[in-house]
């Protein structure tokens, strides 16, 4: 136990090993012998299969939820139950039904639902601490920008069986979209805007609700895929006239963003059909983005874009 400030109360620090034990033994139900027989790498992979990120990541998140200065994210002492916290992370990773959660965690549907959303909302609120727009930029080329579409249940429309505002051209189904921006030179998500209906393409979102005006105001530029063509003052896209070095730079930058998108889609709540409300989608998407930001900070840094000889 570690004593924090008076406002934060007594902080319950858990090591990655303790987090893993709670997850595998007390929640998932692995026997002590099975855990001991396996290598640490195997147990970490088991844990990630149920909770989405490693014990080291969740140990850091758990500590920050108690120490953060973000009031909306701070968990008061009476609510600091690591089992409930991991139950919420399991919801993000495996997206179980309430019946499945009730059986797995031996908790009533009502209490399971309440504690899941409580901790998901707390992790989501850490975005104010983890998803940060820098005060200044070191280079005019600052970030990549991309829209991430997720499949959601079909929204009711008063006339048609399908609402065209929600139609995702990526999935051919109803969807919601977030605009994400990632620093070109750091493992850092710098902006997360949404959710938007997927009827509007990424380019339209960018100029009407997204980052374009902020980029212009700061005098910086982004790199985007071909869907952002036509906004040369704020975003650069792949161009047949690019030199070999510039072409490689843009390609690696976009693949780097795809790497982060892939981390997020590793969570079943975002990779399959989302069956809850739009508000709950916002909770889940932003919480997962925060968790993935911890991942790239702690153990999975995004690769460097610039390689030797790129601009020779």
What do the PLM-derived regions correspond to, one by one?
Residues 1, 5, 79-84, 95-312:
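Short, well-ordered secondary-structure "scaffold" segments embedded in the functional core
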Residues 1-76:
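Charged, often Cys/His-bearing segments associated with DNA-binding zinc-finger transcription factors
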Residues 90-91:
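Short helix-to-turn junction characteristic of helix-turn-helix DNA-binding domains
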